[in-house]
Amino acid sequence: MTGSLSIVADEQIPLAEQAFSKFGNVTLVDGRSINNSLIKNTDILLVRSVTKVNELLLKNSNLKFLGSATSGVDHIDIDYLKSSKIYFSYSPGSNSQSVAEYVLNSLIVAKKKSCIPFSKMKVGIIGFGHIGSKVKKISIEENLVIFSCIC
């Protein structure tokens, strides 16, 4: 790549400028201020969940790639991306370890308040996606009794 791409990135995405500047000119902006006129001649758009990505934002733009630094896609009109032939990538599971550790930390707090030892605690896990599978792994390492439901 010769560094000729126009890239707009949410300023809250850590290291976006360092990671993408070798591909082109990176403009960092407030994710809430990203609008159609700002990205009209942009090749790559990097967003977080604060940016609603839909036809209103993308219509008549030259966008070729959308990257989202999120694990979900509620803020993105994927059908519009497909019909517009805009490539898309997001980050499913990217926060799963942190969330699993938060869940287990909550159990530690509950343990302290109830004086129930870990060996007597029971953990219910619904689903074994990115987070549930990590909660299960940590729970097993801590010898917790696990009840699971793959729904």
Regions found by a protein language model. Give the residues of each.
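Conserved hydrophobic helix-helix packing surfaces used for dimerization/oligomerization
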Residues: L5-I7, V123
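Conserved beta-strand positions in the Rossmann-like core of class I SAM-dependent methyltransferases
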Residues: V8, T27, F147
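Short, polar loop motifs at secondary-structure junctions
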Residues: D10-A16, G31-I34, S49-K52, I150-C151
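A short, Lys/Arg-enriched amphipathic alpha-helix followed by its capping loop at the start of a domain
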Residues: L15-V26
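Short, well-ordered alpha-helix to beta-strand connector turns
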Residues: F23-G24, N41-D43, L63, N143
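A short, well-structured beta->alpha microelement
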Residues: N25-S37
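Phosphate/diphosphate ligand-binding glycine-rich loop within oxidoreductases
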Residues: D43-C115
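Rossmann-like dinucleotide/phosphate-binding beta-alpha-beta segment
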Residues: C115-C151
